[in-house]
Amino acid sequence: MKIIKRSGMEDTFDIKKIEAAIRKANESVIDYEKLTEEKIQEILANVEKACENMKRSPSVEEIQDMVENQIMNQRAFNVARNYITYRYKRALVRKSNSTDEQILSLLECTNEEVKQENSNKNPTVNSVQRDYMAGEVSKDITRRFLLDGDIVEAHEQGIIHFHDADYFAQHMHNCCLVNLEDMLQNGTVISETMIDRPKSFSTACNIATQAIAQIASSQYGGQSISLSHLAPFVDVSRQKFRKTVREELTATGIEPTEEMVNKIAEMRVKEEINRGVQMIQYQVITLMTTNGQAPFVTVFMYLDEVPEGQLRDDLAAVIEEVLHQRIQGVKNEKGVFITPAFPKLIYVLEEDNIREGSRYWYLTRLAAECTAKRMVPDYISEKIMKKLKQGNCYTCMGCRSFLTVYKDENDKFKFYGRFNQGVVTLNLVDVACSSGRDMNKFWELMDERLELCHRALMARHERLKGTPSDVAPILWQNGALARLKKGETIDKLLYGGYSTISLGYAGLCECTRYMKGVSHTDPDGTPFALEVMRHLNDACAKWKAEHNIDFSLYGTPLESTTYKFAKCLQKRFGIIPGVTDKNYITNSYHVHVTEEMSAFDKLKFESQFQELSPGGAISYVEVPNMQNNLDAVLSVMQYIYDNIMYAELNTKSDYCQECGYSGEIKIVNDKDGKLVWECPNCGNRDQNKMSVARRTCGYIGTQFWNQGRTQEIKERVLHL
């Protein structure tokens, strides 16, 4: 059995250390107050059994809590007092410098928690370690100086989650929709270098990737670009090719005809599109930003975003090439084509592409093939989104964070160039368990916790207020988000709906199960779950009216935090069957991963909750290998179009570098009960010698996960 030390390092469970600590406390009291040998052995046996029953590696703090409780259960109160006093003194010593051990353990790659914190960061790489070092300092400053004590305490107890504290010391926002059109059409500045309007499609793609890298280094969340902003440059290349082809033919003594010029020019256009798309794919996954990872970028593919005619045909050609290249994948260091994590792709389902025989059906079928093999694209229903977003269809910012509808000073809808200020998530399971199933107390606690979230969100807002545009010129001065003057603050962009700020929520499923005794999919549980969602939205509306800031409700994609919340719940409330008995809690409004349900029923059920998450949410269905059953994939896509705004299909895409096995690499328990990945063909368990891709929070993760998320992945049932 393993334990997690305070530094985050993993170590072997040693009952003798616990015994030594108990005996030391026991020796410091008078004889008649001492624990007997029999009672000491009973305490040790109970603690060891409790640790084994956790089915994960307990932390040192959790073990010490168990020891305290066991000593007090024996009514040896003076022994317990001495044990607690010693523990407190050690805590004071550690607090005097709270970051040293954490930083040293991540530099030496011995910190298990950091290793598994982010499934798209490799913690052994120097640039990632530098980011983690800076993050530890930021978290320390945030805890000690920037946040109120009760907010810090609530965060540490898992009552709320104050996201991205590792970046909070700086004046940075979360995620955005890049106004690539403005940057390309009107020129921009990157690293103090003027970039004019590009003269070809491939140059436009190159500028886009440079902008993506700079933007990723200036914020901590995801970003999205639209192919519709690149598509106009296909015709720029076309006209250039027509001119050069005519000149080349004339120079060789051939009288050029229009048919001849067009045919050769279109061949070159196709090659140009191939080059440009390949540049985006490879640049994005090979670029390293200042936060030590490839940019978290989403590419939006929406045909109706441009007018019919040549421009839409060019956009369709670009989309087709993106899908072809993603189906192929990218080569790993062994030269094997695998599934890349980025860019994430989103394809809009619309009347012109959703039915067989429609004009762009061939693209939708290609998208289905791509999803079956590479897990992307994800899908937005134009029909449903327009119903929910005042007739508009637009992409999320990165994974799932959606902007609210906003009109500019000219009364025109505006989405590109807007951003999110940050997120604070409420643990709904903790609200429920803290209420003891008393419904009046539940709503009272809910309002208390919401006010805590409100104050935490305003701390985020205040951290951005007064920020000069000079902190990130590409964002605020050079078109990615705005064209502010040097020295001008970003304040006007924080109000009036231009940007959003998000109240996240997690664990609606377990919250309902605790309060109502049934899943939120049960007819007896659904009304309560919907009432919770409406209550959260009402809070956002109230705060919006109070501050003139667009608060919106957001279905949080817990990645590593799911494990933290689960551990905190177990510590505070023990193991409650169906509620706290897993090492994860369910994301947002999702159906529990173990609940049997068809893909269509799941999407239909979750659609009503997605409508109540205007700040962002995504639904998914878990499917087997569908590469030989594209008709089934297409039927799910058509169901998405008719029933839900935003959804994705999860499949498996793994490769073992030891034996060449391609298929699903399994999750098994090792001798210490730890969940590990194992090739079913050769038994390889070396994570450095396998390529595993799983969807964990809207993005595809490729760097493995903590024990809580790994358990969740293992327990997912198929919906098709």
Regions found by a protein language model. Give the residues of each.
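Non-cofactor substrate-recognition interfaces
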Residues: F13-I15, G417, A693
